[in-house]
Curated annotation (Swiss-Prot):
Condenses 4-methyl-5-(beta-hydroxyethyl)thiazole monophosphate (THZ-P) and 2-methyl-4-amino-5-hydroxymethyl pyrimidine pyrophosphate (HMP-PP) to form thiamine monophosphate (TMP). One of its GO terms (cellular component) is cytoplasm. CDD domains: TMP_TenI. One of its GO terms (biological process) is thiamine diphosphate biosynthetic process. It comes from Pseudomonas syringae pv. tomato (strain ATCC BAA-871 / DC3000). The gene is thiE. This is Thiamine-phosphate synthase. Mg(2+) binds at residues 68, 86.
Length: 205
């Protein structure tokens, strides 16, 4: 599957009071994948918000990904992104079917990407590459890892961690396919600025 472009990731705290308006603004600017990420554990709210996002994604012809919840993804008929401690990738693939997008966090380890490919991943994700507000304690990953992954794991490569319009070009130059962005997109003051940033990120790829 060819995946290339902006991978927008929601943050419930960052988007308090402006969740749908900012997400729609991003979709209006152009988003390849949208990941719904909510770590609160409020299942009813998660289902409601994910359902609302799916409606928006269908309108804008964008693929929705659920973070760390294969059952919710299956319920909505969308993809899933799994961290290293968030359940079995083969089980998620079996649950969602062969056409679903299933992404895997690989931190900074090439071996994890090779295993993810063997387990049926659609794309592999690496990071953090820069200082991240979402996961400030995560270990840094060197830029040259991207080329190593590209040479050995022939899957789309998502990069994450403190990505902004200023530092994103070097990630693309090193071979990244998907720019996974949270604060660098949704930390804007207005929906119009979110749209502008989304367009600018997409123009890099």
């Amino acid at each position: 599957m060819k995946l290339r472009g902006l991978y927008a990731i929601t943050d419930s705290q960052l988007l308090t009071g402006k969740f749908l308006s900012y997400v729609e603004a991003a979709l209006d600017g152009g988003v390849t994948l949208l990941q719904y990420r909510d770590k609160t554990g409020d299942d009813s709210r998660r289902l409601r918000e994910a359902t609302e996002l799916l409606k928006l994604c269908e309108r804008y012809k964008t693929r929705l990904i659920i973070n760390d919840d294969a059952e919710l993804a299956a319920r909505l008929g969308v993809g899933v992104h799994l961290g290293q401690t968030d359940g079995s990738l083969p089980d998620a693939r079996a649950l969602l079917g062969h056409k679903a997008i299933v992404g895997a966090t690989c931190h900074g380890q090439l071996e994890l990407a090779e295993q993810a490919k063997a387990d049926g991943a659609t794309y592999v994700a690496f990071g953090r590459f820069f200082n991240s507000q979402t996961k400030p304690g995560a270990p840094a990953v060197p830029l040259d890892l991207i080329a190593q992954v590209r040479a050995r794991v022939h899957l789309p490569i998502a990069v994450i961690g403190g990505i902004t319009l200023e530092n994103a070009p070097q990630l693309v130059e090193h071979g990244a396919d998907l720019l996974a962005v949270v604060h660098g997109l949704f930390g804007a003051e207005t929906p119009q600025e979110v749209t502008r940033r989304a367009k600018a990120f997409m123009a890099l790829l």
